[in-house]
Amino acid sequence: LTKDVILNWKDKVYIFKNKSEFVVFYLKEAGYDLSRILYNSLATPFLTTMNLPNSGQDVLFWQEPITDSVPGNMRLLLESNHRQTKIVVQDYTAYTNLLKLVSPEQASRVAFLGFMYPFARQNNFQNQALILTNSDQIEHLESIVSEVPTMHYHVGAITEMSSRLMDLAKYSNVSLYPNITTEQVKRLYKEADFYLDINHQNEILSATRAAFENNLLILAFTNTSHGPEYTAPSNIFSPMNAGQFKQTLKEALGNRDFLSHLLDRQREHAHVATPEDYKKVIG
């Protein structure tokens, strides 16, 4: 077996040694403007740009980790003048690590740019908290429920609930949703303004991402946090410091300015970008 690509086109047979050769042929044949290519992989897209004419101003969007070395093909990009390429890193840790590994001249071709998120709504400052879980192991839940009674807690699971969880129905400020439906989840994301990421074991329904995109304030413990990229570090507490978790919850409930401040820090930590940020970085 070879990796050749064979194309029958306009009564001719073309044989390409690899996929990137085929892509170059396709792009030229289609008549696209090739003066600028935006891509997010150092595999076929990178090899394709290396086979294009020299005149070009490309952008590589890099969304993978970088630790102690620069990926080989990325180093080729930085050392080559074949086509001027800006490297836009979308993970902040990877960005700071990369800057330590390249020369000042190369660093001028590297930029950081966060993601834009489709925020569904604003936080309404209501005393409604959501927890989605398929485990009855929920860190400090009963003490939180009893010690922060002004909050109403909605606990949903896509399976049946154990007797341990069902016993929480004795609290008037707890609503339980065993076998929760998609419609119920959507409704609760609209009604709740807090998400407590305090369940052990796996996350369900991409809960923290959904909470973030609905502008719910996310609070978690270090041993339960499923979405640290969406949760401000100051809102992730040691399980040994549950008192501070509860105090933060109480303060956020009683002070809109404080809750707004926490939400701002949450978005800042996630490096939320705007269309203006994208225009500034990539033009």
Q: At which residue positions do the language-model features occur?
A:
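N-terminal pre-catalytic "stem/leader" segment of glycosyltransferase-like enzymes
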Residues: 1-56, 238, 272
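A short, active-site helix/loop in glycosyltransferases that binds the activated sugar's phosphate group
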Residues: 70-109
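Conserved catalytic-core segment of nucleotide-activated headgroup transferases in glycan assembly
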Residues: 115-170, 179-182
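Short acidic alpha-helix that forms the nucleotide-activated donor recognition element
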Residues: 181-192, 213
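Acidic donor-binding loop of glycosyltransferase active sites
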Residues: 190-203
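Short hydrophobic beta-strand element within catalytic cores of glycosyltransferases
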Residues: 217-222
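A charged, aromatic-enriched C-terminal amphipathic alpha-helix characteristic of glycosyltransferases
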Residues: 240, 253-283
